[in-house]
Amino acid sequence: MKLSVLVVTLLAVSWTSAQPETFSIQTKEANMNPEPANIRVARSSSAQSNLQWNYWDGQGAVPDGAVSIWNGEEKRTDYVCSCGCSSGFYSTKTGANCHYAYGETEKTCSGFSILVNRDNFENLEWKGGSDGSVPKNAVEVCEKVYVGKNKYGLGKVHTKHEALFLPWHGEEHWYKDYEVLTVNDDVVKQELTQVNYKLDAAHPIKNPPETLRRSSASNSQCRPITKTVALEKAIQTEQSWDVTSTVTFGVESSITAGIPDIASATVSVSVETSLSVSLGSTTTKTTTHTVSVIVTVPPNHYCPVTMVATKYTADIPFTGKMTRTYRNGQKRTTSITGTYRAIQVGEIRADVQRCSEIAGAKPC
């Protein structure tokens, strides 16, 4: 059976499982505080994750949201960490190192990655496995290596070697039965609220006038006449709320927010409204517009009339709160950033062009 798992994208360094005992982030490059490495979730709902591997030197307070367990055997809190492709534990009671198992011994590294669940947003669960098996959405450290534990503490599940390996009092121990860290992706609803637009960063672009319709008023008589020309056109506008992360696709989504008006001299925001949307996708709206104009047409002339509209585009940064509701009733909320993108219509008018003689008209 093909397993659906979490894939770790490590951006700062390239780790291999061949020689993890030589790995150290105590290098000049690693100490430059590399960016957190996001964990990409490879699952049918295709969501980005709030899980991150954050570089940490073990000094000061443990990062907010660090993933931990209570180690009942040692009577302490252990945090999930990794040295290269080997996950293990960090504890405030054992010094500023990450402890991991490799080559039948317990090893440590003093610069390491610690697993952080920002805002405790991801619904993490420990699920059972054995003989190298891992459940759906298991947190992967490297290819075929996953975060695991048993009653003795944290370690790594290596599917190739069909066991959990963990450090214990200076030695490496392995077990055929274990638990694997997973992400619950059974989301049934997500809501975007508390949207705050950064209007000072909004710079709408006024596009050149666009001709939507053409018509004309003609007069074959020998006296001026007055005609009313009406033009009608269905015009499509677009808007989207693109969120940088945490969106779960394929589930019920809604947003409660004001709508920016970008088709004016000053950008303003309407009162809040609730919409059912597909976050990250563009929502379109089609509205039929009608304009009319009275034209005085000289004898034996025709006067072209055009329907002209001016469209505005803008990208506006925003912040907000994303709330997920799971099938089991749990709710998780996180802060998010994103960009509101819109195409709106401003002025719509009828333009009367210069009148011309009707070719071949009978002289008056």
From Swiss-Prot:
One of its GO terms (cellular component) is extracellular region. It is found in: Secreted. Residues 19-42 form a propeptide. InterPro entries: DM9_repeat, Natterin_C. Its EC number is 3.4.-.-. This is Natterin-3. Belongs to the natterin family. Contains 4 disulfide bonds. GO terms for molecular function: hydrolase activity; toxin activity. Inhibited by tissue-kallikrein inhibitor TKI and trasylol. Plasma kallikrein inhibitor PKSI527 and classical inhibitors of serine-, metallo-, thiol- or aspartate-peptidases evokes a minor inhibition of the peptide digestion. Residues 1-18 form the signal peptide. Expressed by the venom gland. Pfam families: DM9. Keywords: Disulfide bond, Hydrolase, Secreted, Signal, Toxin. Shows nociceptive, edema-inducing and kininogenase activity with release of kallidin from low molecular weight kininogen. The cleavage occurs at Met-Lys bonds. CDD domains: PFM_natterin-3-like (cd20220). The keyword rRNA-binding does not apply.
